[in-house]
């Protein structure tokens, strides 16, 4: 499914309809739902989405019916380059980068986005370094 972001509110939309990520009943009954896992009392719901022209798994977590958080996880080849990720977020969304940290790190590559009401935190972890960018609405 194609996911869009309202840059002024941080709300997510699918086909021009708001995607209520903080409502478990809406999430659990959504026709696009791909997976549901329950681990240690936490319910995780997974969706396959296209967001900022990249393929992501959108994961939404609830605890006892209360919204906890959501994040995007990607292994998309088009998102492997941190410059590409930054360009997509900054140029396509109108967000500006406030902070970038790069440090050596020995881990398998993964990247995830956390979105909370107009603020995106990007953590890209590769085999040789990790990048953290805090990106906020202009």
What is each residue range found by the language model?
Residues 1-102, 120, 127-138:
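Short helix/turn-capping signatures at newly exposed starts of structured segments
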Residues 107-124:
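Low-complexity, intrinsically disordered Gly/Pro/Thr-rich segments
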